[in-house]
Amino acid sequence: VHSKNLPRSLAVLFAVNILNFYDRQVLGALLEPIRKEFHLSDTQLGALGTLPIVLYALAGLPLGRLADSGSRKRLLAAGVAVWASLTGLGGLVQSYLMLLVSRLGVYVGEAACAPAATSWIGDLFPAERRSRALAIFMLGVPIGGALSYAISGPAAQAWGWRAALVVAALPAALLIPALLTLDEPARGASETRRPATATAAPPVWSILRIPTMWWIIASGALVNFNLYALATFFPAFLTRYHGLSVGQAGLWAGVGYAVAGIAGGAIAGAWGDRVIHKRKDGRMLSAAVAALVAAPLALIGIRQPAGGAAASIALIMIAYGFLNMYYGLVYSAIHDIVAPAVRATTMAIYFLAMYLCGASFGPLLTGRLSDSLARSAAHAAGSAVVGEAYRAIGLHQAMYVIPALSAALALALYAGSRTIAADMARRDEPGPRAVVQSAQ
């Protein structure tokens, strides 16, 4: 790919990731009207995120292998077509089960995005520019989530939640043609030195022999538990506990996600490329510090009294900004320790673990905890009915899982920082523990 085409390629992939997370998080802004229409518990609401995420995780590995061996461009275009069309069809459902089935299909399409796109970017940009490029790509997470909340909440209040799902599907009509016009780089095109070529082990086992990968996988599960729990229930928390309307909650959550997420991602990208020149563990160590800062900020934000929405939003979203630094820093670290030919497979393994062990539990366990705490609050008050006031108490108390796991995330990242320098050196040394470099 010619250097003049790099900005356009990155811009289109960035736009794909925006739509990816717009459509993935759209239900977060719509949970309250959906709950009331279908008479659902928070556990059932959490399952709308958890069950599709399990399928997403399982689909990611074969799609990652396909991205390493076939056309990433065609795979991405097909994924966009599938997830966008099924998001729109979700606006036609008449039952909770039909909505769940539509979301299962959405997540299968989305499973093609991250392994193929991050592998593509890894082949576009050399190591010294890769952190910024991946950070720009991952800005699609907060921007997509922010747009989803800011547009879908007011749209649902004006026209109903079904219309908001149809709106979410429309940008795909422009993105798919733009994606198909890109030139896909050759695998390993950005490398300035040839990685190790010898290993008898299959790629999956070679990847899992890298000590740092286990800490990265653990960190991925922890960060995704937090961020998916937050994405699912934050607007509902603002509505129930702080008294905002569905439209207000969506708008202010969207603004917070955009400002904090963009700031965190931009800082991570610039800092990650700078610190790697000074110390090989710099990216992992920086991510650990960011998670450590996020924990008390989230704790104080959740502890704000009912009605104190402004302070709560500000503190929790600043914490989110620090957590969002994870992507630009850690995704680049993954590329530092594996060979180009197995990048998509590596990302698929990583996503399998982080979504199956993290994101899949975030919405469901937070929802179950919320239901349990709401029942306890009602029982303590002598009420046989779990009304809206007790649901607000239950969800508020369940949110405390986020700062606790942010602290655990910092520990996992720090542990990974202790092993990454040796793994980066080992990548370029032939031998039984080197990651396979497949013949192209």
Label each region the model flagged.
Residues L58-Q94:
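Conserved MFS/SLC helix-loop-helix module at the cytosolic interface between two early adjacent transmembrane helices
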Residues H2, A186-I217, Y241, V435:
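Juxtamembrane intracellular "pre-TM" segments in multi-pass secondary transporters
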Residues S102-P142:
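Cytoplasmic helix-loop-helix junction between adjacent transmembrane helices
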Residues H39, S71, L92-M98, P126, ...:
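Helix-breaking motifs and short loop linkers at transmembrane-helix boundaries and internal kinks
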Residues F137-E184:
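Helix-loop-helix hairpin linking two adjacent transmembrane segments in secondary transporters
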